[in-house]
Amino acid sequence: MKRALALMGLAFLCVLRAGAAQQTVDDACSVQILVPGLKGDAGEKGDKGAPGRPGRVGPTGEKGDVGDKGQKGGVGRHGKIGPIGSKGEKGDSGDIGPPGPNGEPGIPCECSQLRKAIGEMDNQVTQLTAELKFIKNAVAGVRETEQKMYLLVKEEKRYLDAQLACQGRGGTLSMPKDEAANALLAAYITQAGLARVFIGINDLEREGAFVYADRSPMQTFSKWRSGEPNNAYDEEDCVELVASGGWNDVACHLTMHFLCEFDKEHV
């Protein structure tokens, strides 16, 4: 269409130029009007063109059906060893096993001689026990009850240092928890010629709440002197035993002798 319009314009221009120059149409311009022909036959199929650019991503399709279960895979590598579990509860005792075979016959016993030897050994043990008790009482200065042993340490120390000294010997500061033990300790320091010693009672953790050196609470027994404990000057958190058997709260930084206590099972 555009080509036809261009040819018609060219023909019109030639006519104008011819009129201006007063020349004949044949002399001025020779015009040929081209008319489009009929549509030709379809040509042969051309070669395959180059691949086009990728198109836009289409919309997400619907979720497909679940596929068939695959075959079991091979055994994988061993994983790392996990943490050790907590200890389980103790199991029930097993059934009693069958009796074992009888042993070989023993050597005939000469019982009369053995009984005599055992009797002599019992006498020696009794004698040695009495001698040991005498040595502990007379030489080492130890006092005993059925369950406890007490040692008077004639070294002046502050309360906490005295407690450490007793612990270093395998015991603790003495803790009289009944009248008998308290009377024994009072007689002990009287015989030693002392007026007072540290014992294992204090209220270091909470004022007025006296406990024993092993932190067990005091029960019903106590031997406080009249007007004690009074926490004079707000610094009396430790306890002394005087020769009369009474207790008095004193400052822990004072130095004095002290009594250690030991369990017989651990001596």
Swiss-Prot record:
Residues annotated to bind Ca(2+) 3: E207, D234, D237
Keywords: Calcium, Coiled coil, Collagen, Developmental protein, Disulfide bond, Immunity, Innate immunity, Lectin, Mannose-binding, Metal-binding, Secreted, Signal
Disordered: annotated segments: 40-109
Species of origin: Bos taurus (Bovine)
Residues reported to bind Ca(2+) 2: E228, N230, E236, N248, D249
Xref: SUPFAM superfamilies: C-type lectin-like
Gene Ontology biological process terms from the UniProt entry: antimicrobial humoral response; complement activation, lectin pathway; developmental process; positive regulation of opsonization; proteolysis
InterPro entries in the cross-refs: C-type_lectin-like, C-type_lectin-like/link_sf, C-type_lectin_CS, Ca-dependent_lectin, Collagen, Collectin_CTLD, CTDL_fold
Disulphide linkage map: C166-C260, C238-C252
Compositionally skewed regions (Basic and acidic residues) per UniProt: 41-50, 62-71
Record note on quaternary structure: Homotrimer; disulfide-linked. Interacts with MASP1; probably triggers the lectin pathway of complement.
Residues reported to bind Ca(2+) 1: D203, E207, N231, E236, D237
Protein name as catalogued: Collectin-11
Residues the record lists as binding a carbohydrate: R196, E236, E240, N248, D249, V250
Signal peptide start-end: 1-21
Residue stretches making up the C-type lectin domain: 145-261
Coiled-coil ranges from the UniProt annotation: 110-144
